[in-house]
Swiss-Prot record:
RING-type Zn finger ranges: 226-276
Keywords assigned: Endoplasmic reticulum, Membrane, Metal-binding, Transferase, Transmembrane, Transmembrane helix, Zinc, Zinc-finger
Protein name per its UniProtKB record: E3 ubiquitin ligase Rnf121
Bilayer disposition of the protein: Multi-pass membrane protein
Residue spans crossing the bilayer: 50-70, 79-96, 99-119, 148-168, 173-193
A biological process from GO: ERAD pathway
Nucleotidyltransferase listed as a keyword: no
Lineage: Eukaryota, Metazoa, Chordata, Craniata, Vertebrata
Family: Belongs to the RNF121 family.
Catalytic activity: S-ubiquitinyl-[E2 ubiquitin-conjugating enzyme]-L-cysteine + [acceptor protein]-L-lysine = [E2 ubiquitin-conjugating enzyme]-L-cysteine + N(6)-ubiquitinyl-[acceptor protein]-L-lysine
Pathway noted in the entry: Protein modification; protein ubiquitination
Function: E3 ubiquitin ligase which accepts ubiquitin and transfers it to substrates thereby promoting their degradation by the endoplasmic reticulum-associated degradation (ERAD) pathway which is a pathway involved in ubiquitin-dependent degradation of misfolded endoplasmic reticulum proteins. May regulate the unfolded protein response to reduce endoplasmic reticulum stress.
Cellular component GO terms, alphabetical: endoplasmic reticulum membrane; Golgi membrane
EC number assigned by the record: 2.3.2.27
């Protein structure tokens, strides 16, 4: 059956019969999209029942996959976290190369090189005394940069939606692309940085000996020693430090500011590194403007599922549809 497409381009009707091919390279991007959109509608005309089956397959696969992921995380959390981290790191690269997003690929390579070096330093035995602070400072810097980038991207998107970009004579599509790109950079590297920080935090703390993931501490903690980095504490809790302050948790253990902030926020640790007591973040962070980035960290946890597992689930659904002859 011969299908005919009619697309208005430049005031003239372009008719394409089913055995004829149009040279889309000569058309403008908007006109090319309109032709491809019309072709898609002509191809799928009369497939309503088939599309309903595909929607049911998608919903069923999402539900089953979610249940399996929850059970996997509850029963074998360590393997789940490692696989999720690997997918978070690798999956976007496939789409980057496929779509020729070379800027993202360049940033990803720089991030991977630095993070690989930091992770290498964190997994060495014996652990150097300067390594924990180096690790935490890098991931704190990465966390703050990703947080700021995400906020700027969100503001750019909101400005575009309210039409404020016209005040600066910026096209809406350019402003929206800029905002969404910054928002993606901030969220992606925020999630990836937190996962690598948790991996390094667990390994370093267990290497130092004060913290054990499943047992009692293997060393005695002195009142003047930080349980995260193992170095001496010179600033009293009530004193104002020149470089950093000293924090006392609700369990009365004291830590360097950078160490405990990295432990609680960057590494998603909500317990004391020494006694595993629940940490009161509201009491720890006295400044009101310092509390929102804890909720921001919870947002990143939700996005981890979308970036790491959603492409896998969609690929599985497409495989099922292909085997059943659905399109």
């Amino acid at each position: 059956m011969a299908a005919v497409l009619e697309v208005e381009i430049g005031g003239e009707a372009v008719r394409e019969a089913a055995g004829e091919e149009m040279d889309l390279s000569e058309l403008a991007p908007e006109e090319r999209w309109r032709v491809e959109h019309a072709r898609m509608h002509a191809k799928h005309r009369g497939h309503e029942a088939m599309h309903a089956e595909m929607v049911l397959i998608l919903i069923a696969t999402l539900v089953v996959a979610q249940l399996l992921l929850v059970q996997w995380k509850q029963r074998h959390q360590r393997s789940y976290n490692m696989v999720t981290l690997f997918q978070m790191w690798i999956v976007p690269v496939y789409f980057t190369v496929k779509l020729h997003w070379w800027r993202f690929l360049g940033i990803w390579i720089v991030f991977s090189i630095i993070t690989a070096y930091i992770t290498y330093k964190a997994t060495r035995k014996p652990l150097l005394q300067t390594t924990p602070r180096l690790v935490y400072k890098w991931f704190l810097l990465l966390y703050k940069m990703s947080y700021a980038t995400g906020i700027v991207g969100y503001i750019a998107v909101m400005f575009t939606l309210f039409g404020l970009n016209l005040l600066f004579r910026i096209k809406p599509e350019d402003a929206m692309d800029f905002g969404i790109s910054l928002l993606f950079y901030g969220l992606y590297y925020g999630v990836l940085g937190r996962d690598f920080a948790e991996l390094c935090a667990d390994y370093m703390a267990s290497t130092i000996g004060f913290y054990s993931a499943s047992g009692m501490p293997t060393k005695h903690l002195s009142d003047s020693v930080c349980a995260v980095c193992g170095q001496q504490i010179f600033v009293d809790v009530n004193e104002e430090g020149i470089i950093e302050n000293t924090y006392r948790l609700s369990c009365n253990h004291v830590f360097h500011e950078f160490c405990i902030r990295g432990w609680c926020i960057v590494g998603k640790k909500q317990t004391c590194p020494y006694c595993k007591e629940k940490v009161d973040l509201k009491r720890m962070f006295s400044n009101p403007w310092e509390r929102p980035h804890v909720m921001y960290g919870q947002l990143l946890d939700w996005l981890r599922y979308l970036v790491a597992w959603q492409p896998v689930i969609i690929g599985l659904v497409q495989g099922i549809n292909y085997c059943l002859g659905l399109e």
